[in-house]
Amino acid sequence: MEKTVSEAISLRRSVRLYKDESIDSEKVKQCLVNASLAPTSSNLQLWEFYHITDKDTLGRMAEACLGQNAAKTAQQIVVVVSRKDLWQKRAKANLNFLDQTYDKEGLSDRELRQKKMASDYYSKLIPTIYTDFLGILGFLKYVTFQIVGLFRPIYRQTRLSDMRIVAHKSAGLAAQNFMISMAAIGYDTCPMEGS
Protein backbone atom coordinates (compact mmCIF):
# COMPACT_ATOMS: atom_id res chain seq x y z
CA MET A 1 0.00 0.00 0.00
CA GLU A 2 1.33 3.41 -0.94
CA LYS A 3 2.17 5.70 1.94
CA THR A 4 1.04 9.29 2.44
CA VAL A 5 3.55 12.05 1.76
CA SER A 6 4.11 12.56 5.49
CA GLU A 7 4.63 8.83 6.03
CA ALA A 8 7.06 8.64 3.10
CA ILE A 9 9.06 11.61 4.39
CA SER A 10 9.23 10.04 7.87
CA LEU A 11 10.18 6.64 6.46
CA ARG A 12 12.83 7.73 3.92
CA ARG A 13 16.39 7.06 4.99
CA SER A 14 19.61 6.63 3.05
CA VAL A 15 20.15 2.89 2.66
CA ARG A 16 23.67 1.88 1.69
CA LEU A 17 23.32 -1.88 1.36
CA TYR A 18 20.51 -3.38 -0.72
CA LYS A 19 19.06 -6.88 -0.77
CA ASP A 20 19.44 -8.92 -3.93
CA GLU A 21 15.78 -8.46 -4.87
CA SER A 22 14.53 -7.04 -8.13
CA ILE A 23 12.47 -3.88 -8.18
CA ASP A 24 9.76 -2.92 -10.65
CA SER A 25 11.16 -0.59 -13.35
CA GLU A 26 7.69 0.68 -14.17
CA LYS A 27 7.20 1.84 -10.59
CA VAL A 28 10.60 3.57 -10.72
CA LYS A 29 9.53 5.27 -13.97
CA GLN A 30 6.38 6.56 -12.25
CA CYS A 31 8.60 7.99 -9.49
CA LEU A 32 10.61 9.71 -12.23
CA VAL A 33 7.37 11.23 -13.54
CA ASN A 34 6.74 12.51 -10.01
CA ALA A 35 10.27 13.94 -9.98
CA SER A 36 9.51 15.87 -13.16
CA LEU A 37 6.64 17.60 -11.35
CA ALA A 38 8.97 19.21 -8.81
CA PRO A 39 8.95 23.00 -8.67
CA THR A 40 11.85 24.58 -10.52
CA SER A 41 13.16 28.09 -10.93
CA SER A 42 11.31 29.76 -13.82
CA ASN A 43 9.88 26.34 -14.77
CA LEU A 44 13.06 25.69 -16.78
CA GLN A 45 13.73 22.18 -15.41
CA LEU A 46 17.46 22.39 -15.99
CA TRP A 47 18.11 18.74 -15.22
CA GLU A 48 17.93 15.29 -16.73
CA PHE A 49 17.41 11.89 -15.11
CA TYR A 50 19.08 8.73 -16.40
CA HIS A 51 17.48 5.47 -15.25
CA ILE A 52 20.08 2.70 -15.42
CA THR A 53 18.98 -0.94 -15.35
CA ASP A 54 21.60 -2.66 -17.53
CA LYS A 55 23.89 -4.86 -15.37
CA ASP A 56 27.10 -3.91 -17.22
CA THR A 57 26.32 -0.21 -16.94
CA LEU A 58 25.42 -0.67 -13.27
CA GLY A 59 28.85 -2.23 -12.73
CA ARG A 60 30.57 0.72 -14.40
CA MET A 61 28.46 3.12 -12.34
CA ALA A 62 29.54 1.33 -9.15
CA GLU A 63 33.17 1.88 -10.19
CA ALA A 64 32.46 5.55 -10.96
CA CYS A 65 30.91 5.82 -7.48
CA LEU A 66 34.22 4.63 -6.01
CA GLY A 67 32.84 1.23 -5.11
CA GLN A 68 30.35 2.52 -2.54
CA ASN A 69 28.06 -0.25 -1.29
CA ALA A 70 24.94 1.70 -2.25
CA ALA A 71 26.06 1.68 -5.89
CA LYS A 72 27.50 -1.87 -5.82
CA THR A 73 24.33 -3.45 -4.42
CA ALA A 74 21.68 -1.33 -6.19
CA GLN A 75 19.42 -3.15 -8.64
CA GLN A 76 18.84 0.10 -10.52
CA ILE A 77 20.45 3.54 -10.38
CA VAL A 78 18.98 6.90 -11.25
CA VAL A 79 21.50 9.61 -12.12
CA VAL A 80 20.39 13.23 -11.80
CA VAL A 81 22.36 15.68 -13.94
CA SER A 82 22.16 19.49 -13.79
CA ARG A 83 21.90 20.86 -17.33
CA LYS A 84 22.16 24.65 -17.29
CA ASP A 85 22.78 24.50 -21.05
CA LEU A 86 19.13 23.52 -21.64
CA TRP A 87 17.76 26.96 -20.75
CA GLN A 88 17.07 27.98 -24.39
CA LYS A 89 15.22 24.76 -25.19
CA ARG A 90 13.18 24.96 -21.99
CA ALA A 91 12.39 28.68 -22.41
CA LYS A 92 11.19 27.96 -25.96
CA ALA A 93 8.98 25.13 -24.66
CA ASN A 94 7.44 27.53 -22.14
CA LEU A 95 6.83 30.10 -24.88
CA ASN A 96 5.15 27.43 -27.02
CA PHE A 97 2.99 26.45 -24.05
CA LEU A 98 1.97 30.09 -23.56
CA ASP A 99 1.07 30.40 -27.24
CA GLN A 100 -1.09 27.27 -27.06
CA THR A 101 -2.71 28.31 -23.78
CA TYR A 102 -3.60 31.79 -24.98
CA ASP A 103 -4.42 30.80 -28.58
CA LYS A 104 -8.09 31.70 -28.47
CA GLU A 105 -10.40 34.50 -29.47
CA GLY A 106 -11.73 37.09 -27.05
CA LEU A 107 -8.99 37.19 -24.44
CA SER A 108 -9.66 39.69 -21.68
CA ASP A 109 -7.29 42.60 -21.10
CA ARG A 110 -6.03 40.80 -18.01
CA GLU A 111 -5.28 37.62 -19.98
CA LEU A 112 -3.49 39.63 -22.67
CA ARG A 113 -1.34 41.32 -20.01
CA GLN A 114 -0.57 37.96 -18.41
CA LYS A 115 0.46 36.51 -21.76
CA LYS A 116 2.67 39.50 -22.58
CA MET A 117 4.30 39.50 -19.16
CA ALA A 118 5.05 35.75 -19.30
CA SER A 119 6.20 35.96 -22.93
CA ASP A 120 8.53 38.86 -22.12
CA TYR A 121 9.87 36.90 -19.17
CA TYR A 122 10.87 33.89 -21.33
CA SER A 123 11.88 35.82 -24.46
CA LYS A 124 13.69 38.76 -22.83
CA LEU A 125 14.55 38.30 -19.14
CA ILE A 126 15.61 34.64 -19.24
CA PRO A 127 17.99 35.18 -22.20
CA THR A 128 19.43 38.24 -20.44
CA ILE A 129 20.04 36.23 -17.28
CA TYR A 130 21.42 33.08 -18.91
CA THR A 131 23.47 34.62 -21.73
CA ASP A 132 27.04 35.40 -20.79
CA PHE A 133 30.24 35.50 -22.81
CA LEU A 134 33.01 33.85 -20.78
CA GLY A 135 31.56 35.30 -17.59
CA ILE A 136 32.34 38.86 -18.68
CA LEU A 137 28.76 40.07 -18.77
CA GLY A 138 27.98 38.57 -15.37
CA PHE A 139 29.47 41.43 -13.39
CA LEU A 140 27.72 44.07 -15.53
CA LYS A 141 24.40 42.25 -15.20
CA TYR A 142 24.94 41.86 -11.47
CA VAL A 143 25.53 45.59 -10.94
CA THR A 144 22.64 46.58 -13.23
CA PHE A 145 20.16 44.22 -11.57
CA GLN A 146 21.25 45.29 -8.08
CA ILE A 147 20.59 48.95 -8.95
CA VAL A 148 17.23 48.22 -10.60
CA GLY A 149 16.38 46.07 -7.55
CA LEU A 150 16.55 49.15 -5.35
CA PHE A 151 13.47 50.54 -7.10
CA ARG A 152 11.41 47.46 -7.94
CA PRO A 153 11.38 43.71 -7.41
CA ILE A 154 13.68 41.99 -9.88
CA TYR A 155 15.67 38.81 -10.23
CA ARG A 156 19.15 39.48 -8.84
CA GLN A 157 21.07 36.21 -9.25
CA THR A 158 22.57 36.84 -12.69
CA ARG A 159 26.20 35.66 -12.62
CA LEU A 160 27.34 32.34 -14.11
CA SER A 161 27.89 30.92 -10.63
CA ASP A 162 24.35 31.97 -9.67
CA MET A 163 22.91 30.16 -12.69
CA ARG A 164 24.87 27.01 -11.81
CA ILE A 165 23.51 27.14 -8.26
CA VAL A 166 19.94 27.64 -9.53
CA ALA A 167 20.28 24.56 -11.75
CA HIS A 168 21.67 22.48 -8.86
CA LYS A 169 18.88 23.57 -6.49
CA SER A 170 16.23 22.69 -9.07
CA ALA A 171 17.85 19.28 -9.65
CA GLY A 172 17.90 18.74 -5.89
CA LEU A 173 14.18 19.48 -5.63
CA ALA A 174 13.43 16.99 -8.40
CA ALA A 175 15.69 14.38 -6.78
CA GLN A 176 13.85 14.88 -3.48
CA ASN A 177 10.49 14.31 -5.21
CA PHE A 178 11.94 11.11 -6.68
CA MET A 179 13.24 9.81 -3.34
CA ILE A 180 10.01 10.61 -1.49
CA SER A 181 8.03 8.88 -4.26
CA MET A 182 10.29 5.82 -3.97
CA ALA A 183 9.80 5.75 -0.19
CA ALA A 184 6.03 5.99 -0.69
CA ILE A 185 6.04 2.70 -2.61
CA GLY A 186 8.43 0.99 -0.20
CA TYR A 187 11.68 1.36 -2.16
CA ASP A 188 14.82 2.64 -0.47
CA THR A 189 17.24 5.18 -1.96
CA CYS A 190 20.62 6.68 -1.19
CA PRO A 191 21.67 10.04 -2.65
CA MET A 192 25.31 10.17 -3.73
CA GLU A 193 26.98 13.31 -5.02
CA GLY A 194 29.59 13.72 -7.71
CA SER A 195 30.63 15.87 -10.61
Predicted regions, residues:
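Acidic, surface-exposed loops and disordered segments
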Residues: M1-S195
